[in-house]
């Protein structure tokens, strides 16, 4: 403890002596991070030291945050820093650097607020506000958020709601900034109403003042239902009483409309304008309040908020209003909105803003119904590149990374294509063997376990068969996947079922020939269309050859003069002529009518 007493009196920077002080206290500790039992021992010592410092400050009559103040002579402003804040700074530095347990600083702050008076608590809380950024870091917040919440709640209980309004507001603002938006402890998960906030009003009529006291009691009795709207759905009599009282108030507002001049006179649009947080319920003010446009808006807005609660989404069936109650709610809501619209100043704009807020409120209600899931996103760390350092561009041997890896793999595996253990395309007989075994009735394999139900297996098998056995692949359309299996692999009992019959083979061959003939016909038709011009030229040559043959034929007188010695020559000439004639005729026939192929 003496080591820390001396440490808080030093003027040197905290980082130069904080860790050494801890290591000196826990001997022979030389590590930069304490163990669990060492943390507990250090925390107990610090709490004892803090208690002694607070007691000494109380005896001296000084404020605890200024007790044992240190004056920095080097600073012109005479920076005053007491021993207790200096001790808290040392512990906060150790927690931030993770030399000690992160929740230690929060425990010391809780002890300090409990030992301080309300006047000193303001100074302590001022120190907490100044260290809000450090205390809110994730490594510290996770360890001490519950302790800090308990500390602030204890302060709020000790403060007076009437005299310490500003200090209460500071605490609430700190909690709003310190905790995330999705913190469950601040959203009233169960929807509990503050029924202790009662609006008190006069029960007996005053003497000597002419006031419609029945209307006065009816008007302020509505606050009992606004304070606890859930009571309206528990009993139908309460809803009937509330609806009748509300109808009286709305009728009065209708009977006493406000003019634009009255609305402008009572407007709270000025920057310095204020209003009371509690209603003034004196019966003497009833007439003036009815002429106040802001007062009317407060009452009508309370009605809309309560109606919105009664119809809130996500409620249980037992908490929902009845059908009759829903109709009355609708009529009352329409009437309230109409009164808000005609209430000056700018009634339509005010009503539109209220409707927008109530619509957005449904998102909040659903979020609470879903258990308040967190919706904050951590900021992305922006890593700035080193200034002046340019990243070297990587070069690849073959243009890109994949090609270079493939080339290196080929160099590193020279026997990849000749290795006997390499992956090969299987033979269809080996591939279809498991399916053939499934088709054996004697094996007793159930259908749901057959390989034919494996779509990947069948797809691969069809690809292999299409490359190696086209005839077997053609059986797929008629017999299914089992027909693709080679016949020699099938068991004898089912082989006849999937074996192709001779007549079927003949039909298949004839069908293939027919397909081949049709292809030839199409080729001939294309050939005819391409050789029409050549046919015309061929016909002219044939006519020329025929005229030459007639000119060379001898007359009858010449045949008699030649006599029998030339018979053989004449016969040969006649045969030649006949052959030439037939040849010319065939040529004409071929050119005019090309022969049709015989199927």
From Swiss-Prot:
Pfam families: efThoc1 (PF11957). Disruption phenotype: Developmental defects as well as reduced levels of endogenous trans-acting small interfering RNA (ta-siRNA). Keywords: mRNA processing, mRNA splicing, mRNA transport, Nucleus, Plant defense, RNA-binding, RNA-mediated gene silencing, Transport. Residues 575-585 have a biased composition (Acidic residues). This is THO complex subunit 1. Acts as a component of the THO subcomplex of the TREX complex which is thought to couple mRNA transcription, processing and nuclear export. Contributes to the integrity of the endogenous trans-acting small interfering RNA (ta-siRNA) pathway. May process or transport a long RNA molecule so that it can be a template for secondary siRNA production. May participate in the trafficking of siRNA precursors to the ARGONAUTE catalytic center. Required for the generation of functional messenger ribonucleoproteins (mRNPs). Plays an important roles in plant innate immunity. GO terms for biological process: defense response to fungus; ethylene-activated signaling pathway; mRNA export from nucleus; mRNA processing; regulatory ncRNA-mediated gene silencing; RNA splicing; ta-siRNA processing. GO terms for cellular component: nucleus; THO complex. It is found in: Nucleus. Residues 376-395, 497-599 are annotated as: Disordered. Component of the THO complex, which is composed of THO1, THO2, THO3, THO5, THO6 and THO7. It comes from Arabidopsis thaliana (Mouse-ear cress). Residues 502-522 have a biased composition (Basic and acidic residues). One of its GO terms (molecular function) is RNA binding.
């Amino acid at each position: 403890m003496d080591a820390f007493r001396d440490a808080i009196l030093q003027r040197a920077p905290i980082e130069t002596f904080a860790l050494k002080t801890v290591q000196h206290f826990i001997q022979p500790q030389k590590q930069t991070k304490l163990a669990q039992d060492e943390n507990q021992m250090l925390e107990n010592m610090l709490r004892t030291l803090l208690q002694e410092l607070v007691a000494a400050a109380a005896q001296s009559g000084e404020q605890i945050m200024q007790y044992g103040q240190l004056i920095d002579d080097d600073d012109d402003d005479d920076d005053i820093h007491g021993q207790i804040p200096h001790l808290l700074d040392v512990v906060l530095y150790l927690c931030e650097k993770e030399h000690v347990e992160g929740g230690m600083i929060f425990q010391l702050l809780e002890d300090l607020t409990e030992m301080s008076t309300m006047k000193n608590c303001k100074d302590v809380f001022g120190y907490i506000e100044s260290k809000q950024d450090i205390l809110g870091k994730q490594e510290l917040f996770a360890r001490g958020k519950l302790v800090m919440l308990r500390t602030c709640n204890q302060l709020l209980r000790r403060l007076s709601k009437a005299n310490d309004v500003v200090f209460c507001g500071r605490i609430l603002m700190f909690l709003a900034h310190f905790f995330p938006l999705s913190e469950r402890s601040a959203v009233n998960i169960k929807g509990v109403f503050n029924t202790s906030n009662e609006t008190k009003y006069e029960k007996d009529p005053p003497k000597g003042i002419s006031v419609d006291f029945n209307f006065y009691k009816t008007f302020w009795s509505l606050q009992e239902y606004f304070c606890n709207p859930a009571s309206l759905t528990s009993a139908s009599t309460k809803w009937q009483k509330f609806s009748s009282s509300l109808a009286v108030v709305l009728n009065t507002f209708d009977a006493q409309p406000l003019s634009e001049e009255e609305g402008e006179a009572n407007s709270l649009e000025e920057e310095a304008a204020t209003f009371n947080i509690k209603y003034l319920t004196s019966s003497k003010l009833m007439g003036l309040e009815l002429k106040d446009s802001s007062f009317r808006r407060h009452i009508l807005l309370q009605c809309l908020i309560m109606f919105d609660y009664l119809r809130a989404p996500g409620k249980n069936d037992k908490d929902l209003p009845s059908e009759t109650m829903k109709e009355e709610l609708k009529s009352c809501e329409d009437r309230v909105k109409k009164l808000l619209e005609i209430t000056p100043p700018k009634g339509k704009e005010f009503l539109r803003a209220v409707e927008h807020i109530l619509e957005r409120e449904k998102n909040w209600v659903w979020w609470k119904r879903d258990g308040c899931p967190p919706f904050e996103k951590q900021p992305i760390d922006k890593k700035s590149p080193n200034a002046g350092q340019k990243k070297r561009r990587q070069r690849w041997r073959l243009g890109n990374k994949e090609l270079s890896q493939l080339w290196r793999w080929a160099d590193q595996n020279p026997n990849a294509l000749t290795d006997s253990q390499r992956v090969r395309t299987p033979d269809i007989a080996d591939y279809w063997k498991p399916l053939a075994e499934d088709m054996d009735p004697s094996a007793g394999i159930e259908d749901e376990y057959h390989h034919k139900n494996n779509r990947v297996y069948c797809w691969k098998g069809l690809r292999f068969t299409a490359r190696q056995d086209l005839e077997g692949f053609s059986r797929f359309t008629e017999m299914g996947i089992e027909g693709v299996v080679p016949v020699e692999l099938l068991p004898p009992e089912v082989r006849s079922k999937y074996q192709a019959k001779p007549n079927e083979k003949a039909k298949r061959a004839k069908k293939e020939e027919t397909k081949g003939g049709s292809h030839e016909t199409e080729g001939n038709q294309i050939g005819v269309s391409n050789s029409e011009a050549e046919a015309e030229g061929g016909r002219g040559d044939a006519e020329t050859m025929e005229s030459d043959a007639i000119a060379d034929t001898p007359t009858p007188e010449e045949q008699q003069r030649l006599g029998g010695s030339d018979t053989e020559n004449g016969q040969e000439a006649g045969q030649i002529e006949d052959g030439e004639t037939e040849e010319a005729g065939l040529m004409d026939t071929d050119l005019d009518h090309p022969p049709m192929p015989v199927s």
